[in-house]
Amino acid sequence: MIYFRNCLLFLFLANSIVSFGQSQSIVLDWTGTERVLLGEEPFDVQTVKGFGLDNGQPFFAIQQKHSSIDQEVEIVNTLYEKIPKEQQLIYQQLGLVPADNAQIDAKIVSEGGLPIFSCYILPLRSVNGSLERLISLDYRFLAKNNQQTKDYAASSVLGSTSGKWYRIAVNKDGIYKIDKAFLEDCGINTTNLNPAHIHVYGNGEGVIPEWNGASITDDIAQNAIVVIGEADGTFDANDFILFYGWGAHRWELSGGNQYNQVRHPYSDQSYYYIYVGSDIAPLRIAQAAVIDAPADTLVSTYEYRDVYENDLENLVKGGQRWYGEEFDVNLSQNFNFTIPNVSPVPVRFQVSYASNSRTAGNQISLKNGTELIGQMVLPHSGSYYQRGTLLCADSTPSSSQSLNITINRLNPSVVTYLDRILINAQRELILTGSQLNFRVSKWSSTSNLASYQLGSVNANAFVWDVSDRHNPVRIPLTLQGNQATFKALAQYRELVVASGVSFFTPEKVGSITFQNLHQLPLADYLIVSHPDFFTEANRLADLHRANGLTVHVVQPQAIYNEFSSGMQDPGAIRRFVKMFYDRALLNDPAAKPKY
């Protein structure tokens, strides 16, 4: 098949500073090429000159010094051209399916305290079944609303002393049930407990992005829930709460309606909070209005995604990248997947790995059963370990996928490690098990209103639209036998159908004490200390206070509670510190932290 080189080259214009009000242009020169293999046959893929392929797609990237961090980028005047027919055929053979528009990520970032204009482009797009490529665009800079982008809660909800807080954990996306026994196991007294006083908080946003300007929820958000049996004002034995919990690992949609999992490198669990108190208004899941208009699109399948990944080996003994199975003594290994009710549409596999192959001739091959579906030469640039990605498809899918990965090596010193296997497929909308998450991202340009058809449902089944992760909405169903239909606008949305019979159960973590880091005043010195060293950290703080400095001493878990919804994440500590910087810059720049 093809070796996708996983290198990323940035063009950095060190002496060029672009200022507010100026309009600039980017022109993409499509005279570059990169040689790839389909089986044993080489092909030259056209790329942007000076750049190659990133995860199988042509790309362009640029960085420039900029005049101000407090600006945002507007892209205008994008110009495309049709890709030559012979190149379109190569892209099709590679299984490349671009999005409807080029993906342009343009922003102002801070590097070493200096503002940098950064732009990364995946320049291909699909138009009515034909491929086009971006050849130029203009960009300009606009003033950014600092108050909006640097807004922090004045006080954390965890500072509410009118009730009690309890932390719980979830392992995957889905609908979770909290019953009376679970509440009591958490230490909550359910005698005379009014269900209107039970609230669920949590963000479910996965790992905090490394980019400082990324938009994420500040503090922790209240989640809409369902409380069965709350009408009588007491929490009885048969009463229970339903909420939608998001796991630690998130999925994102990439080009060609394919999904990629963004793995949380520090946690396999996501955390939520139960708050019991009368000072907060209850937030309940609302029901959407019935849509009477006729649908123009029928939906009976959805986009299925799965991933296989084991964290067993860290090749550089540091960093976030871990690998799984080793291909050395055992050069041929099988991986089995089950895709119930798979549609007769090619199943796409993306196999990522690392190998220390230093010479040509070593190969990785992929079989589904006995059929060879992908093959490529291992990367051999001479570096210690190099990453590679094999992208292929099985055109005759079945519910049972038996994937065989084999390394054919000429030298016994060549060792390969599997990173992960990503699967993208189409499944029939048939409920298997207690609940099913589903979504559709690819729509016809003529689609406006969709009618979804669900199979194998019962009279207790229901559907939630969870596109707003904190405020799910219940969608009315029309039931007929074991079939159900509902209507929704033809646009990307995350949905879940549940049998109404059984649900996932969260894991108890424990109660937490009141805290309010958001309410801390500005300080000269910030100390983050593990509990084991907290006494000594406070001694150090007292020493600096005696010298006239204002000091805060904080434990990491307290920061995680307010800045990463309870998950261990170094990005939360960065955001905690950044809160003091941002508040000072808006009010008194001289008051920003110094240590």
Spell out what each predicted region is:
Residues 1-25:
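Bacterial Sec-dependent N-terminal signal peptides
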Residues 22-550, 556-559, 569-593:
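Extracellular pro-sequences of secreted precursors
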Residues 564-565:
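Outer-membrane beta-barrel proteins
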